Each structure stands twice: as structure tokens, then as C-alpha cells.
Amino acid sequence: MAIRPDTHESTLADSRTEEKLERPRMWRVLLHNDEYTTQEFVVWVLESVFHKPAAEAFAIMMSVHRSGVGLAGVYTHDVAETKLNATRRLAEEHEFPLLVTMEPEAEPEDRIH
């Protein structure tokens, strides 16, 4: 006698509805210029917290110095928040008023073409 598969039982694949995975929203971590935080400290933060190579850290620091703000990196919310808090903690420990903020990256449909 042949064993017949149960025709009433659906497979897991059949019972699942297709889920569309979306990329998480990304966040920009920004460093802001001030008159007291040294350029060397900003470079050190970019190298140690944001893992930037020395040349890139220097270029970002110069952007902060010249334009008043510079992009340290773009990350998921949790990573951005962790890097923001680490930067604030280091600035406080070294008695610098370095301002670091985060803002949501523009969604593709939000961008102007």
C-alpha cells in the first residue's frame, strides 16, 4: 500500500504571505564647528569612533572647519546613535564643546531630481 501525502496540509511556503523587506532608514551623523574644539581632537574622533582613515578624517575635519558642518558618516539609527553618544562622551571627557547631531537621510522619493 502506497503512502499518500496529506493533501489537506499546506506547506510553510504556501501558507506564508510574501513579505517585502525594506531597507532600514539611514541616519547622517554630523559634526559642527565651534571655536574651542581642536582640529586634532576632531580628527582623532573621526579615526577612533567612526573608523575613518587619517586622510579621510582630515578632509572631513576641514569640511567642518570651513563650512561649519561635516558628515561623519551614514548609518542605521542604532549605529548612528551609538556613534553620536560615544562622540559626546569623548568630547565631555576632554572638555570640548563639540556638537554632534544626527538627522534622517533623505528617502529616494524625497529627493529632488
What spans do the regions from the language model cover?
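Terminal domain-initiation and capping elements
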Residues: 1-113
